[in-house]
Amino acid sequence: MLYLDASALAKRYFNEQGSGVVAARFESGERIFTSILTFAEIHSAIARKFREREFDSQEFIRLRDAFQEDWLFSISKLDLDLKAMIALPRLVESYSLKAGDAIQLSTAIWLRDSLLVGVWSGKAGETVEFGVADNQLAKVALECGLQVFNPELEH
């Protein structure tokens, strides 16, 4: 199972280092998760790049529609409820994390722990990889016992 935060998922829509690796993970058919917070983060990133004239209105519509199609059909969404936020207080007290990063990490930790106790069904021995393209957040995720997938470091 792969949990993608917005920094990693954005590579699916923007031609950046690691874009091909993220595309391959989608094409592999593996189950991909993210927080509903990511919906706002990716829409915001697409709109910001359009406002900054990184692409024209046709590309804006194409990217927005591609994301919305993935959101509806390819991504499993995790709610921001108290269960998913259980690790958040400890994370922000122990590490210098922005609120959004702490939410993403807490949600990924909840997914991993839920898999361990059988809330989510997976293949025997399946684990959760935390997909992130932010080195500081990746380091914290490793310290929290998550496996990390950084698309910028993959070949």
Where are these regions (language model features)?
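Acidic, PIN/NYN-like endoribonuclease modules and their adjacent C-terminal/linker elements
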Residues: 1, 110-155
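Short, well-structured N-terminal submotif of metal-dependent ribonuclease cores
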Residues: 1-38, 49-63, 146-155
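Short beta-strand scaffold positions
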Residues: 4, 34, 79, 99-102, ...
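Amphipathic alpha-helical segments within well-ordered protein domains
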Residues: 7, 43, 47, 89-92
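Short active-site oxyanion
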Residues: 29-32, 74-76, 125-129
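Acidic catalytic patch
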Residues: 38-39, 71-95, 102-111
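Helix-adjacent hinge/juxtasegments
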Residues: 49, 53-83
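Short glycine-centered helix-capping/turn motifs at secondary-structure transition points
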Residues: 53, 95, 115-118
